[in-house]
């Protein structure tokens, strides 16, 4: 008899729910607002499923509905869906405002974290610039030129461990020969959904994510 492999974390459970109920849950793009009382429907639908427990389902749902993708989708006029993707009522204004407040709060925390990081980085950046410069006169001559040498600093970055990534973590994303800072919005299968400093949101593979 094959031993049933139990799911152990929210990421796995959400992926499992998206597989079982693809018209209700999603791993990419904007998430749909869920029907009020969906947990009870979910618990009944998976009552005989040994992979997940009610406690795990509740925790996974809490994480799913606090995700930025979900909060973005909770706007005026949005329609809630049930497990089969069927309409289950229009999102109430009270819940629209609550989602907007939660999203603003989450973004404020990210902005605060970035500010702290920027405050800590200048010293390191100054040290690097000293290593790559000869003297002041040379620096003035090279001020208007493009150098590829400083880009070599990227070589010190190491690939991140997806298992340790969390929403809100700041990483570097490699695009060609360049890297740019990005904020983790969600860890997905074999990669992560990130927001770049310019506001662009995209999904990148693990081999392009660096610490």
Swiss-Prot record:
Region (Disordered): 113-147
Gene Ontology biological process terms from the UniProt entry: post-transcriptional regulation of gene expression
InterPro entries attached to this UniProt entry: ProQ, ProQ/FinO, ProQ/FinO_sf, ProQ_C
Localization per record: Cytoplasm
Top-level taxon of the source organism: Bacteria
Transmembrane segments annotated in the record for this chain: none
GO molecular function terms listed in the Swiss-Prot or TrEMBL record: RNA strand annealing activity; RNA strand-exchange activity
GO cellular component, one term: cytosol
Keywords carried by this UniProt record: Chaperone, Cytoplasm, RNA-binding
Function as written in the Swiss-Prot or TrEMBL entry: RNA chaperone with significant RNA binding, RNA strand exchange and RNA duplexing activities.
Family statement: Belongs to the ProQ family.
Designated name of the protein: RNA chaperone ProQ
Source organism of the structure: Histophilus somni (strain 129Pt) (Haemophilus somnus)
Lineage, highest ranks first: Bacteria, Pseudomonadati, Pseudomonadota, Gammaproteobacteria, Pasteurellales
């Amino acid at each position: 008899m094959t031993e049933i492999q139990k799911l152990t974390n929210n990421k796995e459970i959400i992926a499992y729910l998206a597989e079982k109920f693809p018209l209700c849950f999603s791993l990419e793009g904007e998430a749909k607002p869920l029907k009020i009382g969906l947990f009870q429907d979910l618990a009944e639908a998976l009552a005989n499923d040994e992979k997940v427990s009610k406690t795990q389902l509740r925790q996974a749902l809490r994480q799913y509905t606090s995700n930025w993708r979900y909060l973005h989708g909770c706007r005026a006029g949005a329609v809630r869906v049930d497990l089969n993707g069927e309409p289950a009522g229009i999102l109430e204004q009270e819940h629209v405002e609550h989602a907007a407040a939660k999203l603003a709060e989450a973004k404020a925390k990210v902005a605060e974290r970035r500010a702290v990081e920027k405050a800590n980085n200048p010293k390191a950046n100054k040290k690097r610039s000293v290593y790559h410069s000869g003297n002041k006169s040379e620096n003035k001559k090279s001020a208007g030129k493009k150098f590829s040498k400083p880009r070599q600093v990227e070589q010190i970055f190491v690939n991140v461990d997806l298992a340790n990534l969390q929403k809100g973590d700041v990483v570097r994303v490699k695009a060609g020969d360049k890297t740019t800072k990005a904020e983790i919005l969600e860890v997905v299968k074999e990669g992560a959904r990130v927001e770049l400093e310019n506001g662009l949101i995209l999904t990148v593979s693990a081999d392009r994510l660096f610490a």
